Amino acid sequence: SNIQKCLRLKDFSEVGDGTHSLAFNMLGFFSFREYSLKQSIDFMMEFCNSINIYPDYVTIHPDKMLEWQDYYKEYNVEVRPDIECIWSDGNIGGYCTEFYKNDIEIGNIVNTLGTCIDIGFGLERLLLVLGLLETKSRIEILEETSLLLIDNGIKLSHNNEGYILKKLITECVLYGSKIDNEDFNTIRNNQIKIYRNYKNLSTRNSNKGKPDSYWLHTMGFDKSKEHLYQNLQ
């Protein structure tokens, strides 16, 4: 078992809704052909009960309902089918069962390859349900995550981690971040330059009527966020 610092971008558009974040601590427990799924469920139900977060319901993939639902038979918890209960990192994966409290997923158990166990519970989600974590705005989460990446040595680039940092800081500055450091200032100045170029080129007769996709693909200007760019001037 361990605690891992994780970065999750899958729910990027939902960040700031009160339940979704980007960087968080994952409580992990792994078993390689030692713990059975039933033992793992028993362990996690006991754990949830011990911290006063007894699940309102759990979910299982429809393909595994008949086989797995009896594992919860001794617990006073609703079992629901969910086609999303399957996990993969691209190379390995498996069906999973997820735990919910107040309609918030607090963790899951992945039956990796059908023989191994991978348990993951988000620490911040647990604290949120317990009322021990203050909710943060979208811009606060974006700023904190950007600074975390910078502190961990990530450099701005067009690839991999550097691209993620670039995307996060761009979102920050467009939504009014006042953070003053080299990376934020670089992105801020670049976005101002992009907007000025757009304003200049878009007035030319040859460019009038060009679709929004043209500006996005040729110069990286997102017209749907033009009102945000205006605040950078």
Segments predicted by a language model, with ranges:
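Short, charge-rich, low-complexity alpha-helical interaction segments
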Residues: T186-N190
